[in-house]
Amino acid sequence: MGNRKIKIARVECDFSQQQLAEKVGVTRQTISMIEAGKYNPSLKLCIGICKVLNKTLNDLFWED
């Protein structure tokens, strides 16, 4: 299924996958895999993504 919430939040912040990756210290491929639902990020990485995108863990990682 993927994580469309991260992609939507990233696009709203006008970040490319590469820009988000650099801000959280991972590769662009990691961000791509998270968005595609093919990678389960660590809690530390989840928190980093939330901080950069100005969202909460619930906003981005809680399933509706």
Residue ranges: model-predicted function:
Residues 1-4, 15, 40, 44:
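Residues at secondary-structure transition points
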Residues 4-23:
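Short basic helix-loop element that most often maps to the first helix and adjoining turn
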Residues 19, 30, 59:
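Residues in the helix-turn-helix
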Residues 26-39:
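Recognition helix of helix-turn-helix/homeodomain-like DNA-binding domains
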Residues 44-59:
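DNA major-groove recognition helix of helix-turn-helix/homeodomain DNA-binding modules
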